[in-house]
Swiss-Prot record:
Protein name (database record): WAT1-related protein At5g47470
Transmembrane segments: 28-48, 59-79, 93-113, 124-144, 158-178, 197-217, 228-248, 255-275, 293-313, 319-339
Family listed: Belongs to the drug/metabolite transporter (DMT) superfamily. Plant drug/metabolite exporter (P-DME) (TC 2.A.7.4) family.
Native source species: Arabidopsis thaliana
Domain EamA: 40-172, 219-338
GO molecular-function term, one example from the UniProt record: transmembrane transporter activity
Subcellular location: Membrane
Amino acid sequence: MQFFCVNLYRSVLNLLEERMKTEMIEEMVIVGGLVMVQFVYAGNSLLMSYLMSLGLGPFTIVIFSTFATFIILSPFAILFERKQWPNELSLRLIGKLVLISFAGVTLFQSLFLEGIRLTSPAMATAMPNLAPGLIFFIAWIVGLEKMNLKCVYSKLKILGTLLCVFGALAMSVMHSTSISHKEEDDTPIFVFDRDKVVGCIYLLGAVFVLSTNVVLQASTLAEFPAPISLSAITALLGVLITTVVLLLQNRKTKVLASSLISFGNLVGYSVLAGAVSGACVSFNGWAMKKRGPVFVSMFSPFATVISVAFAVLTLGESVSLGSVGGMVLMFVGLYLVLWAKGKEGFSEIESFESEFDSKKPLLS
């Protein structure tokens, strides 16, 4: 009996070691992919800024690029994920899909673009860095993020999230402040601007909508475990809802608001942006399915780091000491969260080994 228990113990340990190796490789793929996604997002923002500088309206870009995302992702969804589709679409699942589309495409874009118009691009870049903290809080409330305040790893996750948020905000705000001081030395420091206050409220609303939408996506993936299909469906619904909203607002939707860009170039840019966005959203959905919404959101401040680095390398802008300090805080916070979540994942293995310690007799 003792010989059988020893062999069983060793075989289970071997299986656990193989599982740990597989999870380590998967972890490297997820982390590397999420960093690359932020590089792509930063480049996509530059492309969108360039298109708007040519006179294209932001909603025109959103509608074209989102529809291109649907066209590009649909064949892959049918080819690779058809077996994962549910047999029946419940009213609850349909409601979630419509809500994700409305919140992620129409409502978020409306609030975010209005916030940019009333404030500044620098403030709009800083505000989304609040998303990891909000996503952590919302996921905790709805039960998608495991938390035990008596556990040291849970406390480290909270500390790491706060450090990441504060560091990203400090980096972006300090960087934009150093630029504004160079350009506007004679401007008073304390000036109450009603439009900027309202714009900040719009941006906060956009960040809250984005955070809620990310958690809702994670919840929907449990019922609809097909991230590519989910991205394609929500892209199509988002285009339809955005178009209807624009028509209800009696806005004239001009396809070409500027003669600087041809229709063919617009289609080409839209296909490029749609392909990039579709790939990134699908990978984020897969990573969210594997590691949860909080883990994925912790990488979003990387876009700010990339934007600052690009401004320094190409535009010759200087980086203040506060920006460097914020960057250090952000990376420390990110490392704490990754380390704590990894330790939480292997806590079950450690508890198993403690129950079957090889130094203790198996039979008593």
